[in-house]
Amino acid sequence: MTETDTWHWDQPQIHALFELPLPELLFRAQEVHRRHFNPGQVQACTLVSIKTGACAEDCTYCSQSARYDTGLEREALIDVETVREAAQRARASGATRLCMGAAWRGPKDRDLETLVAMVRAVKAEGLEACLSAGLLAEGQAERLAEAGLDYFNHNLDTSPSYYDQVVTTRSYEQRLQTLERIRDAGMRVCCGGIVGLGEARADRVEMLATLANLPVPPQSVPINRLIPIPGTPLEAAEPVDPFEIVRTIAATRLVLPRSYVRLAAGREQMSDELQALCLSAGANSLFLGERLLTTDNPDADADHRLLHRLGMTLEPRTHSCAELEP
């Protein structure tokens, strides 16, 4: 099989990747990874919550849903100066991108001016700017793009087949429509999913097929490991076999060869050895900082120590800007 930018991946092909002996799968993933990226470098992003809790959505995994008693305190939209200070700390830690997350169904037009100012503040600090703020209405993507927003994050979470077991307050089609609006506005897409929602391997395969066959592949693909939150419907979810996480990372690398594959939420529960295996499988991006919105993350010093032990370095800012254009 020859890898091309226009390759169409069907589900049986992706399933066959998952079924490979792990050494063979890792070999193929690393081979593809080296064609497009420096295997000794990792992109670093920092995630900050700009509006916390009281979300109207019913995502069964989320601590921020107003429908579940998780003990999370609601916080209003923070001010621009707080975002600027977060960007300065992120840059000092080695991050090249600040990702801002807001617990909304979608931004209201009245909040757009504040979001625009936040984007400009991040850009003024020399970082790429990413925003995760739910569904985008018509015209909102264009305003954010004009402000200089590099990325908008909107995950698919899981497969179309399993989706209604996870979320019922927004449809899969609405998510795909938001991705289309992001692309049409000229921004890059950050879109991935979650492993451990109770889905089967077939759902992970279907999700990757959906991502790989979008009109333009997402330039950034976060793969999250579920962190069960007390009070949510998934508080007692069974953990996924760690090797299945590695297989998911490797398959993602193979079907999305030019995308940054981010080892996102759930690293705090991973051993250094498992994280190293995921990096060997093709993950080349992570979040720096001890918090991911409302959950724990390894602190930056621990990540720097791990990368040093692995002989790896953080990717410099100039390389991060050279990602595949939409």
Swiss-Prot record:
**Cofactor: binding comment:** Binds 1 [4Fe-4S] cluster. The cluster is coordinated with 3 cysteines and an exchangeable S-adenosyl-L-methionine.
PROSITE patterns xref list: RADICAL_SAM
Task: Note whether Metal-binding occurs among the keywords.
Answer: yes
The Radical SAM core domain covers: 40-264
Residue numbers binding [2Fe-2S] cluster: 99, 130, 190, 262
Ligand binding ([4Fe-4S] cluster): 55, 59, 62
**Which pathway features in its UniProt record?**
Cofactor biosynthesis; biotin biosynthesis; biotin from 7,8-diaminononanoate: step 2/2
Q: Which Gene3D superfamilies match?
A: Aldolase class I (3.20.20.70)
CDD domains with a match to the protein in the record: Radical_SAM
Q: Which SUPFAM superfamilies does the entry mention?
A: Radical SAM enzymes
Tell me the function of this protein.
Catalyzes the conversion of dethiobiotin (DTB) to biotin by the insertion of a sulfur atom into dethiobiotin via a radical-based mechanism.
Q: What does the sequence similarity comment in the record state about its family?
A: Belongs to the radical SAM superfamily. Biotin synthase family.
Do you know which NCBIfam families this protein is assigned to? bioB
Subunit-level organization: Homodimer.
Q: What is this protein called?
A: Biotin synthase
